[in-house]
C-alpha cells in the first residue's frame, strides 16, 4: 500500500511541477487569443465642431445666423454661408463579433455614427460607417485574405451618396493591438484615408492604476477622391450611389462662391487645368473653380499592453476643400488652420473628439478582466502548483526511500 501511495505522490508532484512551469512558458502564451464574443461601445460627449450642410448648400439657403451676412445674399452665396460653426456633434461606435468566427479567426463589425445633437433622428445623422474586418485570433492582426468591407453613408455631407467598398485586404491594426504590445510603431489603418501608416509609441502612462502605452499618429492632408475612386472601381463597376459619393468630394463653383479673389482666382482655375471648348462662355472675373476634399487627423490612442485593449482615444478630424496638395498642406499649417477654424470657408467637417468617461471605464474593465485571467494562469496557479508539487514529490520520495530501507533491513534478517 505504501508503495502505491509513494508512487502516486511522486507522479502527482512531478505533474504539478511540470504544469507550473508549462503554464507561464507555454500554455499562457498559446492561450493569448481574442475571444469569440467581443462586444464594446465607445463614444464621445457632445463637442463643438464645424460642419458643411450639404442640403442647405444644394438649396442655396444659408444656415441659421448667416442669412444677413453680405456674402450670404444674392445669387452667388459663398460656401461659408452653409457651414455651421460651433455645432454640437457627437460620435459613437459599437463593435461586436460576427460570422465568420471560429477557433482561428474572429470577424469584427464596427458601426460608427457621427450625429448632431440639435436634431432628432434620422435628420441628425452626419455620417455613418459599417466596417468589417477579420482578425487572426492568435496574432490579433487582420488576415491576409481580401475579406474586409466598408459601407459609408454621409447624408449631411452628401444627401444622395452611399458607398460600399470591398472586399479588400486590410493592412494594419485598428480596433485591437497585439496581446503583448511592444514599445514601437505599428501600421494603423484609417477608414477615411483608406490606407495604413505608422502610429508611433510615444511613452508610458497610467490609467486607473494600470500601465498603458500611448501612441500618436498624424495623417497629413490626403485627397479623398482618388483613393476612394480606386477602391470603388475595384469590382469594375461604379453604381449611381458611388458616383454621387465621389461627386461630393470634388465641388465646382464660381471663384467668388469659394471666396477666392484677385490673383488667387486665376491660380485656382488653372490648377485643375480646366480647359474650355471653343465658344464656351466664362466669367473672366469669377471662373469656375473645382476644389477637392482633403482629410487630416491627429490621433492618440492609449493601449493596455498585456491585453492589447485600447482603453482611451482622441481624434482631431478635419475635412476641407483645397485646389491641390500644395494648398492643402499650407491650409494645414497651424496659423492657417486656426484661421479656418475661427472663420470656416472651406471646411466640410471638423470635430475634435475624445472618448467620454464611460468609454474609458468600460474598456479598462475589459483590459483588467483580461489581465486577471493572465495573472491567474501565469502567476497565481503556478505559484500554488509549484510548491505543492515539490512538497508532494519530496514526500513521495521520502516514503519510497523509507520503504526500500525497510525492505533491505527485512531481507538482511
From Swiss-Prot:
Q: Where in the cell is it found?
A: Secreted, Cell wall
Q: Which cysteines are joined by disulfide bonds?
A: none
- Spell out the protein name for this chain: Porin PorA
Q: Which residues form a coiled coil?
A: none
Leader sequence range is: 1-22
* Organism from which the protein derives: Corynebacterium resistens (strain DSM 45100 / JCM 12819 / GTC 2026 / SICGH 158)
What is the annotated role of this protein in its UniProt record?
Answer: Forms water-filled channels that favor the permeation of cations.
- Region ranges (Disordered): 265-288
* GO cellular component terms listed in the entry, alphabetical order: extracellular region
Sorted keywords for this record are: Cell wall, Ion transport, Secreted, Signal, Transport
Give the main location. Answer: secreted
